[in-house]
């Protein structure tokens, strides 16, 4: 399963590293996701949730 936020849909983004000579190499920026248990349809479920969603109170841990 991809490390994508279950609540906000945030997923890793891609781009380039740029050196002083402006060479470019591919890289990715990951999302700060944590595996937590939350209530989904009244039942506990383990899902990946972003730290931003946890801090802002979008989900309640079980």
Swiss-Prot record:
Polar residues compositional bias, start-end: 11-20
Record GO terms (molecular function): structural constituent of ribosome
GO biological process: translation
UniProt xrefs under Pfam families: Ribosomal_L28 (PF00830)
Keyword Ribonucleoprotein belongs to the record: yes
Keywords attached to this entry: Ribonucleoprotein, Ribosomal protein
Annotated SUPFAM superfamilies: L28p-like
Region (Disordered): 1-26
One cellular component (GO) term of this entry: ribonucleoprotein complex
Membership in a protein family: Belongs to the bacterial ribosomal protein bL28 family.
Protein name: Large ribosomal subunit protein bL28
Organism: Exiguobacterium sp. (strain ATCC BAA-1283 / AT1b)
Highest classification ranks of the organism: Bacteria, Bacillati, Bacillota, Bacilli, Bacillales
